């Protein structure tokens, strides 16, 4: 509705990750640098953590656009609570392998054969595991064991782990993950956006959908928006969606700070809080 009222080509603040809307904040720029370094090493584990809605999935979607898919094969896993055997099966399926499950040895053999074939064809292999905080210790250990596969002295698999802050804590302090910890070659925790990044972030997304100055945005909004959302991108998107909707319903050409305050108050008391 509001996108039609304001003449946008699409919704600028949708919650699903879209690399077309990628905004390089200070913390995301650092994360990309660590990812680039880690991928150039071609081995071990890269770990990216951050709060819910901090932009981990959008970062990875942006990264995938930059990867050379003729030289790098990527498998992706979004985890629920997997045990070790399930992790092996899901990893195999992420690479398109025809495995039936229930036979860990067969699944491992299929993965090893696949990795060797990719290497012989001049391709590296990356496994991306999202929501890593849901993995059991056993599943994480199985991922470490997969990193043992080699062709000569060259590792055949590299793994990117994405998780919430509790995964960062688990990895840092669990005695059972000492060996995995030693194989982490790059890590970064996504911080919230800084106050001065809120306006550029919002305008970046608006410009992407053809914003032409309508609606105008009161300059007092940015400080209040940062305070209300803590600089978390998903929270900003939620608030801005509701603010634009209010503006369209009331046929406003200017988004005022009192409108933002009304939206924040409403969201704090309904079933869709800023969280």
Predicted regions and their residues:
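Short regulatory helix/loop adjacent to the ATP-binding pocket of P-loop NTPases
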Residues: 64-67, 167-183, 192
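Walker A/P-loop nucleotide-binding motif
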Residues: 41-63, 80
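C-terminal alpha-helical "lid" subdomain
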Residues: 179, 208-275
């Amino acid at each position: 509705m509001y996108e039609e009222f304001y003449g946008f080509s699409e919704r600028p603040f949708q919650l699903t990750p879209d690399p077309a809307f990628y905004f390089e904040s200070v913390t995301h720029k650092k994360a990309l640098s660590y990812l680039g370094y880690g991928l150039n090493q071609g081995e071990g584990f890269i770990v990216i953590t951050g709060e819910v809605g901090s932009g981990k999935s959008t970062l990875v979607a942006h990264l995938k656009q930059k990867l050379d898919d003729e030289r790098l094969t990527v498998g992706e896993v979004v985890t629920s609570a997997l045990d070790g055997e399930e992790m092996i099966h899901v990893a195999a399926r992420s690479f398109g392998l025809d495995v039936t499950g229930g036979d860990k040895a067969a699944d491992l053999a299929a993965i090893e054969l696949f990795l060797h074939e990719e290497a012989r064809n001049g391709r590296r292999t990356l496994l991306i595991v999202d929501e890593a905080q849901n993995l059991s210790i056993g599943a994480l250990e199985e991922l470490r064991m997969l990193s043992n596969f080699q062709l000569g002295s060259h590792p055949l698999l590299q793994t990117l782990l994405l998780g919430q802050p509790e995964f960062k804590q688990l990895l840092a302090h669990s005695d059972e993950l000492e060996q995995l910890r030693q194989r982490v070659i790059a890590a970064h925790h996504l911080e919230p956006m800084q106050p001065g990044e809120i306006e550029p972030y919002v305008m970046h997304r608006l410009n992407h959908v053809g914003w032409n100055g309508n609606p105008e945005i009161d300059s007092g909004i940015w400080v209040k928006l940062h305070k209300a959302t803590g600089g978390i991108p998903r929270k900003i998107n939620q608030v801005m969606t509701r603010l634009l909707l209010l503006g369209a319903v009331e046929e406003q050409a200017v988004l005022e700070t009192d409108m933002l305050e009304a939206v924040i108050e409403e969201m704090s008391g309904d079933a869709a809080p800023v969280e």
